[in-house]
């Protein structure tokens, strides 16, 4: 069933209704005509019940709203839809009347007042937190304290993230007193706790509210890449790269780095050889942290039970057993310390069909106990057509969980299987459970991300992300009894293509793996993998190459073999974000359309991103173990979807888009000063926000225009973009010389084993930049070996961490205006207006004036357009005055260009404005329902 809306007559303050009448028909059109920006944010806690169990709250991530449902014995009925921030991923109910929503892209938390038994709601406060917040729980005395996970960075964070400092924790938990949020712009936290891990995700709280658990997201697995300069040349026979060192035809591979895993105090390769003396850091792999929620202020738990290590590689969600206090962590564990894809005929080894394991790890007084959910799989066999008896017993990518009040049963959402799994907690804890499809509940929608138990009604409510809907499950019959669709503004190509990224039942013969196993929610896994295939041939490289400066000759390859050898060595997992308009794919550019047509920008030959992505189809067989490649029509749908996924704004760059002096100095050198054979850094790492202007919202080059270039690497690389450099901070300590920089001493504990470059073996951008130091023989135009040269490299590091991307840093930012916050909110609104005037975002304002909902879109020139045709252009000052009188609230949000009409004034893009539809009794969330 579709969501319906109760008709509400829209009234507005006297200040607004006296303005001029807007011309009708200005925003006519349909949803397919407007650009929808796909961020593919991973939901964490998408559902919550009110404490009295009468209301169900759901995040509508693509529509940037909180949906409110009335819960009854006969099912769910929709009551209200409340605009919040961009990409809401988690919700928690503090009381029956107050709900908090975590907005992943807006770096904010919306405090929503629910009224009229769920018939309406409004944002009364917007809290500003660190970058990419993900989860929220209430704990402490009276559950007054809100705990929120966020990355240790972001423009709203009141600290220096120290991105270039070793040994810094990068997992933050913000804590607010819900009864005393303060009068500052973004709220005043009680504390910001920082833990020694990379970006966090999930939270869990004990039933008594005294202890909160926080988990890292990409927590790692104690693996790293040892730079190829630290590995002897000549292959396994001389102590170098483990063999085979040729392909099946005997063609020697180039030298590469190697992947190591820390076992105790030793760093070992896949042959068990020790490289400990070469590694300049250790990885403690701290994964889950306990917090004393009642301390003043809340503080980490010290001593036993304070930190848990070795929980998993990618940690999704957590749940606490209310009966025994044990913590369950849904996770996947990567096997990237092993090698190769394909059948393994020549090498005798392969990861095909067994690259990850889906697990629930049990934490308790006895320690950390991982439980492989698919222990029935016979990994010695591969590639049977699906479905098959083995694959149907599997559960892939476990995410949200819920435990019954007596602690006896655990329900888990298997995101990659479109099922719920049911486990006896006793059997799970003792590892005596037997995988059985009889303990699965099939879901009509795909991609379940979260669930809540309604034990009094014997129901489970599950959010299914593939179709943006809610399934209702009868726990007695273990059957889905209802499925309610939420309004979804995503284009059909996104909805139809998304499952091919995540659906393990369709992707792998064992039913346990998908592309999304490594490309977590369309991004990366912060690991490197050696996925060469020695059973394959060497292939020619058709990609265009960046030319040299004339004084360095006319051979841009400098005689290097540019071919694609099938033994490529370790390479970092690349994000699937932002691939449109950036040419060939993979670090070498070996996925390209270069043999389909002459190469020319845009979209011809090697620059045809659609054709390039389709070259990944063999990986369904060679890596995931599928019986066959995807049929062409399915691969086309996958391609159409994935090329729309976008990068978020850069969280290091100032919100006004003005670089700091150091960043600007770094950019000036990067763009203008020759430091290598091609010229300046920007000769290869192209920065052109208008590159290929005909590509519309996908235009622009942000560190690469898709060409390859010579860079003194052992293979010939495609020039990589630099939009996500800030995500790779956390590895420090190198055993090799870069330029004139000495080898690092032992650097102690670090949070990441992979850094920069194609294989992740370069710890910092400063190390990378030092590779372009002046050398009279190797690089006579290099960066001077002087204090000034050192400063240049430091400045370039700062610039690259704040690198240009498709969206300006202001996109997603928001603030709520009320009478009590007018003084602090005013300057932030001024900033949002200024950036909208600069064309960096479209500014919308949503809220209430008395009992009436209202929406506005900034039209430029200091004027807003209302969501009613009988309300004329509204001056900025008049709108602010209206919001601060008579108890009004108005939340301003900078939204991506092209989405302002939909988010601000015409939700379904049917040409009938939302306010007009509410007055007429038609549905603003149904393009077929018009006044």
Language-model features: locations:
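Short coil/turn segments that connect the beta-strands within blades of beta-propeller domains
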Residues: 52-54, 96-97, 143-144, 208-210, ...
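Periplasmic c-type cytochrome electron-transfer domains
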Residues: 153, 213-216, 220, 224, ...
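A short beta-strand motif characteristic of beta-propeller blades
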Residues: 34-38, 45, 77-82, 122-127, ...
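Beta-strand-rich domains and repeat architectures in extracellular enzymes and scaffolds
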Residues: 35-67, 283, 396-401
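Short, conserved, GDST-rich strand-edge loop motifs in beta-rich repeat architectures
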Residues: 149-168, 215-282, 329-357
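Beta-propeller blade signature
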Residues: 163-180, 283-293, 348-365
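Short loop/turn segments that connect beta-strands within beta-propeller blades
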Residues: 71-74, 113-118, 178-181, 292-296, ...
């Amino acid at each position: 069933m579709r969501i319906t809306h109760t008709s509400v007559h829209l009234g507005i303050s006297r200040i607004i209704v006296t303005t001029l009448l807007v011309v009708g028909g200005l925003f006519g059109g349909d949803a397919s005509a407007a650009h929808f920006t796909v961020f593919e944010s991973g939901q964490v806690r998408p559902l919550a019940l009110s404490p009295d169990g009468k209301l169900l709250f759901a995040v509508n991530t693509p529509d940037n709203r909180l949906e409110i449902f009335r819960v009854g014995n006969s099912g769910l009925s929709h009551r209200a839809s409340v605009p919040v921030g961009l990409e809401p991923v988690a919700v928690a109910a503090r009381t029956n009347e107050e709900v908090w929503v975590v907005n992943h892209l807006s770096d904010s938390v919306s405090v929503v007042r629910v009224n009229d038994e769920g018939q309406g709601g409004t944002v009364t406060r917007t809290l500003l937190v660190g970058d990419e917040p993900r989860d929220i729980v209430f704990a402490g005395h009276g559950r007054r304290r809100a705990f929120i996970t966020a990355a240790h960075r972001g423009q709203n964070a009141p600290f220096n993230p120290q991105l270039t400092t070793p040994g810094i924790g990068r997992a933050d938990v913000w804590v607010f007193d819900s009864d005393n949020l303060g009068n500052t712009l973004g709220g005043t936290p009680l504390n910001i706790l920082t833990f020694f891990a990379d970006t966090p995700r999930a939270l869990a709280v004990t039933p008594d509210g005294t202890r909160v658990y926080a988990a890292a997201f990409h927590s790692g697995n104690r693996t790293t890449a040892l730079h190829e300069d630290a590995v002897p040349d000549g292959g396994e026979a001389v102590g170098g790269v483990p063999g085979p060192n040729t392909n099946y035809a005997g063609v020697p591979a180039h030298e590469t780095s190697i992947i190591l895993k820390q076992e105790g105090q030793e760093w070992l390769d896949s042959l068990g050889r020790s490289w400990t003396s070469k590694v300049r850091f250790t990885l403690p792999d701290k994964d889950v942290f306990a917090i004393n929620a009642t301390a003043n202020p809340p503080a980490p738990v010290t001593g036993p039970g304070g930190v848990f290590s070795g929980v998993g590689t990618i940690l999704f969600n957590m749940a606490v057993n209310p009966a025994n206090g044990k913590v369950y962590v849904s996770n996947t564990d990567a096997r990237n310390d092993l090698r190769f894809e394909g059948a393994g005929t020549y090498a005798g080894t392969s990861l095909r069909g067994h690259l990850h394991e889906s697990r629930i790890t049990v934490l308790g007084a006895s320690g950390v106990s991982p439980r492989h959910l698919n222990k029935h799989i016979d990994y010695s066999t591969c590639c049977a057509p699906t479905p098959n008896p083995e694959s149907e017993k599997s559960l892939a990518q476990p995410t949200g969980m819920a435990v019954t009040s007596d602690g006896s049963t655990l329900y888990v959402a298997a995101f990659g299987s479109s099922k719920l799994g049911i486990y006896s907690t006793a059997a799970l804890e003792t590892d005596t459970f037997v995988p059985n499809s009889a303990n699965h509940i099939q879901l009509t929608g795909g991609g379940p991300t979260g669930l809540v138990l309604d034990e009094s009604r014997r129901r489970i409510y599950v959010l299914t992300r593939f179709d943006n809907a809610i399934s209702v499950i009868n726990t007695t019959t273990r059957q889905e009894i209802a499925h309610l669709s939420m309004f979804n503004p995503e284009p059909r190509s996104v909805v139809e293509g998304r499952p091919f990224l995540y659906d393990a039942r369709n992707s792998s013969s064992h039913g346990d793996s998908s592309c999304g196993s490594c490309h977590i929610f369309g991004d990366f896994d912060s690991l490197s993998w050696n996925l060469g295939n020695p059973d394959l041939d060497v292939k020619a490289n058709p990609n265009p190459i960046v030319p040299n400066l004339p004084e360095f000759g006319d051979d841009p390859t400098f005689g290097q073999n540019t071919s694609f050898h099938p033994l490529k060595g370790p390479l970092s997992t690349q994000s699937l974000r932002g691939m449109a308009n950036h040419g060939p794919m993979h670090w070498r550019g070996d996925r390209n359309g270069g043999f389909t047509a002459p190469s020319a920008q845009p979209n011809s030959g090697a620059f045809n991103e659609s054709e390039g992505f389709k070259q990944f189809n063999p990986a369904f067989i060679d890596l995931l173990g599928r019986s066959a490649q995807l049929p062409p029509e399915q691969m086309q749908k996958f391609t159409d979807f994935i090329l729309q996924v976008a990068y978020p704004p850069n969280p290091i760059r100032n919100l006004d888009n003005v670089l700091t002096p150091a960043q600007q100095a770094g950019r000036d050198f990067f763009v203008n000063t020759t430091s290598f054979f091609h010229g300046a850094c920007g000769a290869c790492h192209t920065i052109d926000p208008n590159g290929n202007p005909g590509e519309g919202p996908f235009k622009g080059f942000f560190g690469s225009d898709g060409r390859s270039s010579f860079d003194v690497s052992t293979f010939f690389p495609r020039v990589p973009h630099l939009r996500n450099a800030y995500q790779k901070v956390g590895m420090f300590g190198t055993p090799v010389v870069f330029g004139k920089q000495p080898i690092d001493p032992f650097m102690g504990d670090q949070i990441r084993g992979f850094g920069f470059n194609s294989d992740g073996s370069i710890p910092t951008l400063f190390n990378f930049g030092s590779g372009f130091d002046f050398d009279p023989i190797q690089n006579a135009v290099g960066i001077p070996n002087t204090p000034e040269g050192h400063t240049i490299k430091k400045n370039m590091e700062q610039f690259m961490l704040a690198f240009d991307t498709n969206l300006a840093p202001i996109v997603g930012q928001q603030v709520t205006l009320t009478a009590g916050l007018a003084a602090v909110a005013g300057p932030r609104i001024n900033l949002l207006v200024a950036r909208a005037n600069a064309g960096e975002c479209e500014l919308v304002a949503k809220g209430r004036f008395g009992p009436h909902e209202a929406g506005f879109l900034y039209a430029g020139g200091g004027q807003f357009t209302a969501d009613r045709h009988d309300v004329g252009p509204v001056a900025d000052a008049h709108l602010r005055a209206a919001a601060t009188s008579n108890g009004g609230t108005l939340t301003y949000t900078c939204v991506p260009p092209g989405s302002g009409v939909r988010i601000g004034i015409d939700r379904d893009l049917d040409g009938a404005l939302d306010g007009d539809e509410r007055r007429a009794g038609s549905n603003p969330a149904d393009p077929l329902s018009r006044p």
